[in-house]
Swiss-Prot record:
Transmembrane segments: none annotated. InterPro entries: Auton_GlycylRad_Cofactor, Form_AcTrfase_GR_CS, Gly_radical, Glycyl_radical_cofactor_GrcA. Pfam families: Gly_radical (PF01228). GO terms for cellular component: cytosol. Residues 5-127 form the Glycine radical domain. This is Autonomous glycyl radical cofactor. One of its GO terms (molecular function) is formate C-acetyltransferase activity. Acts as a radical domain for damaged PFL and possibly other radical proteins.
Length: 127
């Protein structure tokens, strides 16, 4: 089974706040992002990470579409409730940045209509 985690405490400082996909059956981990020491998509054995504490990150994995052999995975590291709370209480989330059509933008700089649209598009249950 594959699960997503964010490392919150580790003996290795390069792991702090990094995001990983763990495959416990294969004993492997894939780096999604880290401040340093690990490259994006780098695969390592789980025991190479050493001692760490983490929090689970919900994975939203939809069936991928193959186009000329390519695949796409969209990993959302926010919950719907977080964005809805940011709409109601923008002062609590001044640094909340999202990605829209390849551009990074502060969520609070969007109009209320755009914010609702982002929430609706990001957290669909079915097509």
């Amino acid at each position: 089974m594959i699960k997503g985690i964010q490392i919150t405490k580790a003996d290795n400082a390069d792991l702090l706040n990094s995001f990983w996909l763990l495959d416990t059956e294969k004993g492997a981990a894939r780096c999604l992002c880290a401040k340093g020491g690990y490259a994006e998509d780098q695969m390592v054995a789980l025991d190479e990470l050493g001692a760490f504490e983490s929090r689970d990150v919900e994975l939203d994995v939809a069936p991928s579409v193959r186009v000329e052999g390519g695949q796409h995975l969209n990993v959302n590291v926010l919950r719907r409730e977080t964005l809805e709370d940011a709409v109601k209480h923008p002062e609590k989330y001044p640094q909340l940045t999202i990605r829209v059509s390849g551009y990074a933008v502060r969520f609070n700089s969007l109009t209320p209509e755009q914010q609702r649209d982002v929430i609706t598009r990001t957290f669909t249950q079915s097509l």
